[in-house]
Design a protein with these regions (language model features):
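Short, Lys/Arg-enriched segments at the junction into DNA-binding effector domains
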Residues: 2, 114-146
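N-terminal/domain-start alpha-helical segments
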Residues: 1-120
Length: 146
């Protein structure tokens, strides 16, 4: 799977990157919400791990932006904020799952696998659409004629 990690805490971001790469995933990591949201709307990902507390825009706003651009993209909130209100806000913003820190690595990997299975079972919207001599690449957000 191609996974986008959005986590401002450097040691956790690097640890998650190493863990997921060792498990065979391709990982792109960002520490700030705005560049991560831009990346997640421009590029194709199979899953997003998203922290709630980020230095520029919060994870709720990143989640909303990603959800608008990619309705079927699995998003797992991974955050220290574990109140009922925080969990409900994350899920209402479009997160598919919510895991509080600290977490067990096995549980995180199981949740990633579960979201991946669910996404694989759901037919995706076409990434490339062709009509009347025009080609729209929704994954790259480009259009060309001919």
């Amino acid at each position: 799977m191609r996974i986008l990690i959005v986590e401002d805490e450097r040691s956790l971001r690097e640890g998650l990157t190493d863990l997921l790469a060792a498990a065979g995933h391709e990982v792109v990591a960002h520490e700030n919400g705005k560049p991560a949201a831009d990346c997640g709307t421009r590029e194709a990902f199979d899953l997003v791990l998203l922290d709630l507390m980020l230095p520029d825009i919060d994870g709720i706003e990143v989640c909303r932006r990603l959800r608008r651009a990619r309705p079927a993209l699995p998003i797992l909130m991974l955050t220290a904020r574990g109140s009922e209100d925080d969990k409900v806000a994350g899920l209402e913003a479009g997160a598919d799952d919510y895991l509080t820190k600290p977490f067990a690595v096995r549980e995180l990997l199981a949740r990633i696998d579960a979201l991946g299975r669910r996404a694989a079972a759901t037919p995706a919207d076409p990434e490339v659409v062709e009509a009347d001599g025009c080609v729209l690449d929704l994954g790259r957000l480009t259009a060309r004629r001919g």
